[in-house]
């Protein structure tokens, strides 16, 4: 009788451990998938911004590319809503609605507003990614990772805010004081990039990043001031990629420490 009770008790304990382990694995898998999907949405939005910017700037549509990006974004956002927990679905639906509105209305925007609207949605996604990551770190009680991640996150968001101001100032270059305003934001941007270099040196030393930093430096020092508006937007696009790659580096380190390495992004660039 004692042996039977001991056996049943052991089975119950093992079943409980298995249940908890299975539940924890499901929680890990859901957070991992949410971050992966949000990361893909950011990447696709960046590509959509570049494609629509080209269309608005030069009045030429690459309709096949735009259709492919629309389909990919629509699919990713649907998966995002489906993957999220019931109580979190509304905030992902808000993102889905906002992106859908942009996909329908971007061709009514000016070049500057198109840049700003895409930037808002990209930051929206990054804040959602931050929320998932912070919650994951809290559940796992990884205070060591949390503190480092939070510090890096602040530097990255400060850099994004500076980049937004730099982008906005491009449209005002021909106005009184516009050139000095752009130079001021360019100087601040270079300082922010130096801070990011401590976080992810490889992101800052990429060819596109190095070229853009050099161009900004030449503009600030006055040795290269004959850049067109299109060229300046190109510089800010390269810097946007640099900042995104820096955050991707930070996020990848955290997620790999908690669960698994993040997959390679499906689109290059």
List the predicted regions and their residue ranges.
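Hydrophobic alpha-helical segments
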Residues: 1-269
